[in-house]
From Swiss-Prot:
Residues 31-40, 137-159, 325-335, 379-397, 439-457, 487-496, 506-524 have a biased composition (Polar residues). Residues 1-23 form the signal peptide. PANTHER family: SEMENOGELIN-2, SEMENOGELIN/SEMINAL VESICLE SECRETORY PROTEIN. Residues 26-65, 132-159, 272-295, 318-358, 379-417, 439-582 are annotated as: Disordered. Interacts with SERPINA5. InterPro entries: Semenogelin. This is Semenogelin-2. GO terms for biological process: coagulation; negative regulation of flagellated sperm motility; sperm capacitation. Residues 336-345, 525-552, 559-582 have a biased composition (Basic and acidic residues). Keywords: Repeat, Secreted, Signal.
Amino acid sequence: MKSIILFVLSLLLILEKQAAVMGQKCGSKGQLPSGSSQFPRGQKGQHYSGQKDEQHTKSKGSFSIQHTYHVDVNDRDRTQKSQQYDLNAQHKMTKSKQHLGGSQELLNYKQEGRDHDKSKDHFHMIVIHHKGGQAHRGTQNPSQDQGNSPSGKGISSQYSNTNKRLWVHGLTKEQASASGAQKGRTQGGSQSSYVLQTEELVANKQQRETQNSPQNKGHYQNVVEMREEHSSKLQTSLHPAYQDRLQHGPKDIFTTQDELLVYNKNQHQTKNLNQDQEHGQKTHKISYQSSRTEERQLNCGEKSVQKDVSKGGISIQTEEKIHGKSQNQVTIHSQGQEHGHKENKMSYQSSSTEERHLNCGEKGIHKGVSKGSISIQTEEQIHGKSQNQVRIPSQAQEHGHKENKMSYQSSSTEERRLNCGEKGIHKGVSKGSISIQTEEQIHGKSQNQVRIPSQAQEHGHKENKMSYQSSSTEERRLNYGGKSMQKDVSQSSTSFHTEKLVEGKSQIQTPNPNQDQWSVQNAKGKSDQSAGREQDLLSHEQKGRHQQESSEARNIVITEHEVAYDDHLTQQYNEDRNPVST
């Protein structure tokens, strides 16, 4: 009995080896065994399968060999490791029904059938032959159909030329033949299809037991257990169809992810740009300065001269340096001279503007200023949450500069904070104006509401603050005596300076209603009276500033100067003023 059993086992092993050798030869040469027809080569991505069943009756069992032929033509995706099968292929229904009954039991006895009792079981062997173009790599993947064969030893189910994915848009692929799991495949939809990789290279009595992923069991009822053993070429995986919808596989997926990342970055950058480009942005802030602007901070005495400012415009600069959350809204209505320079047509600063902060005595001379311009620059340096809303209707040209204060001053106004004696001289001022300075250094919560209608020409230049300075305005902070002279100013303007050093939450609302008359203009050239009034205003302003600095609360110093020629100014004010409500 033992000799008979050994003889039968040896015959079975010989037959399996022969079948494997025949399968390899047929697959590599592109030849099909007798009994099968030659398949056409002109259809790319189509599978043709034929079956050849050879029954070898033995003493205690039967042995059947099933051949499945796949014909492929020159597919560039043959380097990929997956083949996708059509879940809705109607011509494969007959093949799937052949093995629905016994596939579960065959898979349950798969382990025992490969190692033990080979003469007592019904052996079912699947040989998949692939006919097609050349293969670049020999990535082999065991099939789920191979799990139906208890005698999987020595069975060749894939060769080097079968390493391709057959993929057609909108359709799923042809299913593997002679599989009990095809019941689930034929009932599935095209969008929920799975890519079944059914390639395996078996040689020289190597046992390969593959185990598919758990999602296989959810869709394929006949897959019980498949394990993978010691084979670098043995790859079994069921990928969802959406992962393999791309023809170029993981490369396309990674490329798509990279594009999505780039798109997200671009979207983020675009969002930031749109936030800044309400007033136009050039380099992380909006800075539009026509011909020449100089900002200097000097430790020693220096002379600043501004000459021949021909025409002004409107300049809006917005910069946010915020550590918390802030909202910055700037609404500007102007009727002065506007012309587009650079981007978004919102930058027009006078040809040469100099801002200087001096520690020692210096001399500032402003000459030949013909016209001002309008410049609005907004910046927030806030460590908490703040809302800054500035609404500035302007009719004439205003040039304002702000540093740590709110200041309404004419084109020939200087602000100084002196520890020692200082002399302020204003000469040759043709037209007077009104100067208001307000400074807040607040560590709590504050609200500042200032209503400022302006008629003169405004030019706002701001560095880390909101500023509106005339074309010939200097601000100086001197520790020692200094001298300032302003000469030959043709037109006056009004500058508004506001700064809030806030560590908590703050709100700045600066509407500019056209209610009160803040600007004094003299069309007939009464320069001596203007100079005298302005000198008084500055002295009064210094007093108000010292009182303001003593108390760290809301300090708004408003100085109004009644003029003797009020009727003439009122008439001129009404003529020059075109109210714009925001």
